[in-house]
Amino acid sequence: MTIKTYHLYVVSAEKQIFSGLVEKIQVTGIEGDLGIFPRHTPLLTQIKPGLIYLVTEDGKTEYIYISGGILEVQLNIVTVLADTAIRGEDLDEKRAINSKLQAQENIKNLNYDMSYTQASVELAKALAKLRVIKLIKKAI
């Protein structure tokens, strides 16, 4: 008998976003993309702002935006702890576009209130949200 699924928890500072059996997930760690399948080697790593791509036990694909956080892989349990996590279908495209434009403007016109690093992080978060929205539209 082979194990085909494991339990995934995605938790933000505000609430639990996802809890269920999945076949696999894909997420971006600090050293690159990670594909987590059943019986993956235990792992604890930081994850970058971006998306979690997951396939549920019934084959359904879902996308979750995360602002960064921690990924913990145990034998049959994977946990994502994120500062912010939003299901893809709950993202607001106009708001994400405005955030992107504001971040680009902040990078162009740096002042004492915001560093280049802060502005770059905000831009990365906005681009990640837009990527999730684009993937969801493409899947429909």
Curated annotation (Swiss-Prot):
Annotated Pfam families: ATP-synt_DE, ATP-synt_DE_N
InterPro entries (UniProt xref): ATP_F1_dsu/esu_C_sf, ATP_synth_F1_dsu/esu, ATP_synth_F1_dsu/esu_N, ATP_synth_F1_esu_C, ATPsynth_dsu/esu_N
Record-level GO cellular component terms: plasma membrane; proton-transporting ATP synthase complex
Membrane topology term: Peripheral membrane protein
The keyword Transport belongs to this UniProt entry's keyword annotation: yes
Oligomer and partners: F-type ATPases have 2 components, CF(1) - the catalytic core - and CF(0) - the membrane proton channel. CF(1) has five subunits: alpha(3), beta(3), gamma(1), delta(1), epsilon(1). CF(0) has three main subunits: a, b and c.
Task of the protein: Produces ATP from ADP in the presence of a proton gradient across the membrane.
HAMAP family cross-referenced by the UniProt entry: ATP_synth_epsil_bac
Name the UniProt record assigns to this protein: ATP synthase epsilon chain
Naturally occurring in which organism (per UniProt): Baumannia cicadellinicola subsp. Homalodisca coagulata
Source taxonomy: Bacteria, Pseudomonadati, Pseudomonadota, Gammaproteobacteria, Candidatus Palibaumannia
Gene name linked to the record: atpC
